[in-house]
């Protein structure tokens, strides 16, 4: 927010849990009151609770599905109501290569991210007539605090699966989101943009 304001923009911070509908309502109501409209939604909230399928608890499965998939659904539901009235909107959902190809030890996470892809395509078909596009980004490995703690051996093995030979920078994912939110992508909807260095083809 400080960086946005420092560059001459208007930014506000609103804390909300995507699993609590009342907090989501408050988020959109406050954003509309303070900023005037809701034009772009990027669904990026997500958690992981990794474990092998046979040992995974129902609670760990449900928590990941509820946050990653149901939270995305709730955010789209509330945002699209406002976007439909103004007949314009850009919805960008963050999926994952795990949702495209699966990943051992991440049955819950992969299921949630695959669900986001199906949700994206359904929302795109329902909302297109109101001038709203809905697309997904599927990142591969990204340089973040989460990936920084991985053992070096794991990171090197992961890089061997990536034709470009490196993890994505956070800016690589941000650039994809900026493109899909822009007028340059006004004729693109219901698509999944893999930003993974060629990991999944």
Predicted regions and their residues:
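Substrate-binding pocket helix/loop in short-chain dehydrogenase/reductase
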Residues: 24, 52-53, 60-65, 147, ...
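Short, small/polar-rich loop/turn modules that mediate ligand/substrate recognition or access, typified
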Residues: 37, 128, 133, 169, ...
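Residue(s) in the substrate-gating loop at a strand-loop-helix junction
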Residues: 96
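Alpha-helical segment proximal to the catalytic Tyr-Lys
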Residues: 81, 125-129, 186
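Active-site helix of classical SDR
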Residues: 76, 112, 120
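C-terminal helical subdomain
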Residues: 136, 159-184, 188, 197
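The beta1-alpha1 cofactor-binding region of Rossmann-like NAD(H)/NADP(H)-dependent oxidoreductases
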Residues: 15-27, 58, 171-172
């Amino acid at each position: 927010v400080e960086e946005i304001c420092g560059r001459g923009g208007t930014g506000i911070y609103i804390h909300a849990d995507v699993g609590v509908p009342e907090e989501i309502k408050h988020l959109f109501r406050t954003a509309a009151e303070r900023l005037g409209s809701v034009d772009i939604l990027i669904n990026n909230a997500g958690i992981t609770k990794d474990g092998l399928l046979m040992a995974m608890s129902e609670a760990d499965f449900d928590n990941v599905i509820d946050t990653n998939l149901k939270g995305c659904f709730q955010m789209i539901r509330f945002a699209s109501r406002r976007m439909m009235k103004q007949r314009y909107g850009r919805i960008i959902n963050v999926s994952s290569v795990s949702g495209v190809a699966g990943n051992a030890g991440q049955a819950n996470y992969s299921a949630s991210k695959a669900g986001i892809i199906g949700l994206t395509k359904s929302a795109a078909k329902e909302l297109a007539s109101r001038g709203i596009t809905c697309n997904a980004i599927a990142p591969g490995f990204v340089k973040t605090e989460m990936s920084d703690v991985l053992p070096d051996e794991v990171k090197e093995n992961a890089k061997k699966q990536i034709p470009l030979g490196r993890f994505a920078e956070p800016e690589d994912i941000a650039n994809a989101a900026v493109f899909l939110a822009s007028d340059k992508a006004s004729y693109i909807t219901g698509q999944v943009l893999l930003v993974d260095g060629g990991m999944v083809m």
